[in-house]
Amino acid sequence: MIASVRGEVLEIALDHVVVEAAGVGYRLNATPSTLATLTRGAEARLYTAMIVREDSMTLYGFADTEARDLFGLLQTVSGVGPRLAMAVLAVLEPEALRKALAESNVAALTRVPGIGKRGAERMVVELRDKVNLVPVQAGPPGSTPAVAATPVREQVVEALTGLGFPLKQAEQALDTVLAEQPAADTSTALRAALSLLGKNR
């Protein structure tokens, strides 16, 4: 089991990062908030979770052990796999997720694409007591987000639809964000759009 990876950041994409450690490039799927803390060419440490399937081995990277442990905890809920768990952490930061579960806030959980009312209720019932067993841990201080290699609009819309938001809804949210922040880079625009979409659901 690979518990963490430390090394130079070779590539930052919309949903993953490549970190070179001991001459090996590791591809780690990550949330927008985690990717926003990384800088290409700088050294980074990410805590990891590995999902092994018959035909694949996938690494997921997190800024701290709290997010990694919550990722694992989410998957103990029936019907929640790695992709949906990552979508939850993309929309709700660890603190917000803890609060939503503790307060049985079904509405907050249904902001996540792919989670309906029943799924959110099941998540609350199964995790409300367990979530307090995951230690709270602050992540490392963030650094300057990477500069987008392609137009911001194209990248952000692709990322949002990849998380499960409808294309039209993603475009409308991004238009609102860019109207208010025309100079926003990809990471900033993506996080703002996610926040807006979460409020509107």
From Swiss-Prot:
Start and end residues of each stretch annotated as Flexible linker: 143-153
The record's section on InterPro entries has: DNA_helicase_Holl-junc_RuvA_I, Hlx-hairpin-Hlx_DNA-bd_motif, NA-bd_OB-fold, RuvA, RuvA_2-like, RuvA_C, RuvA_C_sf
Question: Quick one: where's region Domain I?
Answer: 1-63
Which GO BP terms sit in this record?
Answer: DNA recombination; DNA repair
Q: Matching Pfam families, A to Z?
A: HHH_5, RuvA_C, RuvA_N
Q: Provide a Gene Ontology MF annotation, just one.
A: four-way junction DNA binding
The protein's location, in the record's own words, is: Cytoplasm
- Identify the Gene3D superfamilies for this entry: 5' to 3' exonuclease, C-terminal subdomain (1.10.150.20), DNA helicase RuvA subunit, C-terminal domain (1.10.8.10), Nucleic acid-binding proteins (2.40.50.140)
Q: Where is this region: Domain II?
A: 64-142
Superkingdom as given in the UniProt entry: Bacteria
**What keywords appear on the UniProt entry?**
Cytoplasm, DNA damage, DNA recombination, DNA repair, DNA-binding
Give yes or no: UniProt keyword GTP-binding.
no
The UniProt annotation puts the region (Domain III) at 153-201
One Gene Ontology cellular component annotation?
Holliday junction resolvase complex
Q: Which residues form the signal peptide?
A: none
This molecule's function is given as: The RuvA-RuvB-RuvC complex processes Holliday junction (HJ) DNA during genetic recombination and DNA repair, while the RuvA-RuvB complex plays an important role in the rescue of blocked DNA replication forks via replication fork reversal (RFR). RuvA specifically binds to HJ cruciform DNA, conferring on it an open structure. The RuvB hexamer acts as an ATP-dependent pump, pulling dsDNA into and through the RuvAB complex. HJ branch migration allows RuvC to scan DNA until it finds its consensus sequence, where it cleaves and resolves the cruciform DNA.
Instruction: Share the domain note from the entry.
Output: Has three domains with a flexible linker between the domains II and III and assumes an 'L' shape. Domain III is highly mobile and contacts RuvB.
UniProt subunit comment: Homotetramer. Forms an RuvA(8)-RuvB(12)-Holliday junction (HJ) complex. HJ DNA is sandwiched between 2 RuvA tetramers; dsDNA enters through RuvA and exits via RuvB. An RuvB hexamer assembles on each DNA strand where it exits the tetramer. Each RuvB hexamer is contacted by two RuvA subunits (via domain III) on 2 adjacent RuvB subunits; this complex drives branch migration. In the full resolvosome a probable DNA-RuvA(4)-RuvB(12)-RuvC(2) complex forms which resolves the HJ.
By sequence similarity, the record places it as follows: Belongs to the RuvA family.
Q: What is this protein called?
A: Holliday junction branch migration complex subunit RuvA
Organism of origin? Nocardia farcinica (strain IFM 10152)
